[in-house]
């Protein structure tokens, strides 16, 4: 494994931004940035052995700050939405910035995704660290977060999150990479085939906040229990799709057991033959089909992206869990260690 580090730029407040490249013996590589502990590139072979970058992203580091799509970065302190920017913990109500309609999204405008993390290269890995102060974006507790990335010789990227706090808080971490298995900038993902290890999903209101118990996917456009083209029913007249101009929905992973790795999703491109298996220890997975990519900064392909040119498969806890006691808890207390993992494993079908 070859790991290189370069100075990529400087943040608006003067922090150095580093770019790391992890390249395995086959020439497949990953690029990671200290902006939001982000994935900038994943370059893997297709069915003919041609290596191409399959992750959406930008050429200039400055474009990663406050980009609408949150491309490739790790949002926090709470990924996804918290209703009305409020939650109560141990009898105390906390107020958070409202930045997505009436709700709080991805930790707010100054979320983890828009911060420069400390970073270091190890023998076969790169590790990022961020310290979030008590009261930052309204959240309680001084929080130390570590994002540890490993790239394997068989083209699997593993991200392990760990975190500790000195005061009870809520925490939900994921990575917001957008995938196009035909190659970044090479058309839309509507013909990609998707499968979820999920028999239920979370219906939402029109602001994409879950309304209660999970519903079965069977017999609805939300059913990806077998491989199905993403575009097959994306325009169906169905509430979950009408609210978001496509898929922006949370699915509950079958047979969830805390700390146990299992398959969350599989994505396949018949055009390139590339296949992605996503595994996680987390209880849920959010699919977002890039419904609002228009107008984002120019991509690595040299132009702006169009809607549906990438799909985000975000392994995480459920949206609005701090206000939904029926969901798996997102509360982290002093003396506990938050630990969750996501693996993106790439292969080809010939």
Show where each model-derived region lies.
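An exposed, glycine/acidic-rich loop-and-rim segment of catalytic or binding clefts
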Residues: 1-350
